[in-house]
Every structure is written in C-alpha cells, then in structure tokens.
Amino acid sequence: FIVPIRDKEMNVLPGITILDCGHKMGLNGVDNGIITFDSVEIPYENMLDRFAQVSDAGEFESPIPSDNRRFFTMLGTLVGGRIGIPRSALAAAKTGLTIAIKYSDKRRQFGPETAPEVPVLNYRMHQRRLMPYLANAYALHFGLQYLTKRFMHRSEDDMQEIEALAAGMKAYVTWNTRDTLQECREACGGKGYLSENRIGDLKADTEIYTTFEGDNTVLMQLTAKNRLGEFRKQFGEMNVSTIFNYVLGQAKTAIAEKNPFATRNTDESHLKDAQFHLDAFTYREKEITASAARRFKKLVDDGLDTFDAANVMHPHMLQIADAYLDRVFLEQFSAAVAETSDEALKEVLNYKTKVY
C-alpha cells in the first residue's frame, strides 16, 4: 500500500508515530527510523496491485496463477538488493586492501645487520596475511559480474536459481569483507587504527552488511536448500543411497585423472593446474551435497519430521552452500582469465586463481 504519513505542511498525520533509530555503529548518514500505525485507515485505491488484486467482492485475483511463480516474481526487487549489497561490500574490501598493501610496501621494519630495513610487504608472513584476500577480491569481482549479468537478462525460469545464488553471494562476500578489513586494520598496526586512514570507517559502515537484506546464516541455508532441491530434481524418485553412490562414483571417475588423492600425482605442475583445481572444487561440492541428501533422508526415515531434520542439518547445509559458492567463484574467475588477451596481465591473474 501507499500510505501518506504527513500532511501538506509536513506535520505527522493522526495515528502515525515516527521515531529515529538513534546513533549507530556506522552509516549514520542513512536515516533509519521506526513508523507505527494506530487505527490508520488506508483507501482501497492505495493498494499496489501489479501482481495481485482484491476484487470488490473481496476475492483474491492475480495474473500469475502459480503461487510459486508469483512469489519469486515479487522477490525480484529483493534479489536486486542482495546483488547491490555485496558489490558495495566488495568495493570496501578493495579499498581496504589498497590502503594496507600500499602502506606495507612503504613501511620499513628490520632487515639484515649491514643493509637498510626492508618493506613489511617483503616478509612472507605479511604476504600470507594479505595476498589471499587480494585473490578473493578478484574472484568475488568476477563472480558478482556473472550474477549481475544473469539477473539483468533473467527469465522467469531462472529466477529461483538466481535468487539462491544472490542470497549465497551476499553472505559469502559480506563475510569476506568483514574478515578482509579486520586483517587490513591489523596489518597496518597503529596506523590502521587512525581515522585518517579510513579502515575504521570502512569497518563500521560495512558491519551491518552481514545482517541487512537478510541474515547471512539464514541466506546460506536458503542457498543450500535450493542446491538440495536441484539435486533431487536431477534424480527424480531414485533411492537416496543409490543417488549418493552414483554421484560419488561419477565424480570420482570424472576427477580421477587429476585428483592427487586418486592418482597419487604430487607433481608441482599437476597440483597447480587450473583445471585440476576446478575439478577438485566440483568434486567437493557434489560429494558434500550427496552426503547431505543421504543424511537428511536417514533422519526422516528414523522418525524426525522435515522441520526437525532440517534443524539438525543446518551446519551441514552451510557446507553445501560454501562448496557451491567456492566452485562458482573459481569457475567465473578462471573463465575471465581465459578471456584476457593481455599476456602479462593473464600471467598475474592466473597466479591469483591459484592463490584463491
């Protein structure tokens, strides 16, 4: 509904109370507030009825007959928000990394007795603190590009998968931003604590990203539920144990040539091979999903209702979502590198895919 809350003189209308949320950890330029309504009547013509209407006789009507399709059609705006939030979060992570890496390249500390002090970035441990997050930033950048393009060119049939992917990426990226900025702050020492260096503001403003547009843990459960649903569709009414054994067998066969656990191949070129990495991520995703399906079926067979079984399964379901998103991000990162024509840039990006 469209609900007027003030008159033409901007006075609050009767029955309506407007309050400010108060000072927050960050984003204080955003005017978050509370509105309450007490016996406020809303005219019928104020109803937003693009996807559903109520007739004069009080009957519900909709041009979209399927309840499921109507629900996901109306979720379109929410999905857009879940794409915008991680893009904003990733921008903050990139900024923090730029500040921390540039600072550590200039900040000198210790060195050989007869030589000048060396940049902090020269220390392997410092590289291990920051470079994995830099690799993450590239992987997440290309993954979010992929999601954005799919959303912009979506069809109704794609919406459930896009909604699940957006939910998962929102959680994955905002958690990564939280961890990235914390590591950047610590890697800059006391300088990272100074407001003039911006990391504190970046941390404060992005902290809320892990819970608005949906709590991250709940969103990951949504993603996992979608993956289990897709898993079930692929195999129809097959026995879950049969499905598990089939998928495991297929996955092991597909990866056997490049799986060091199967072939005992510990050659450096093999272990650093990009296709091996992607095969391994795919294998992991399939195995975790199949094992979760089998476990869920057993819980239900043992007498738990589906609600309680899902409650027991939540930690396992988060692993499904993690494995799925790990694979998608690596897949899109690798695809972007393959399309890069600048050979010098391609070499650097290839290295970053390996770090990821």
Across the structure, where does each feature detected by a protein language model lie?
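Flavin-dependent oxidoreductase catalytic core characteristic
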Residues: 2-356
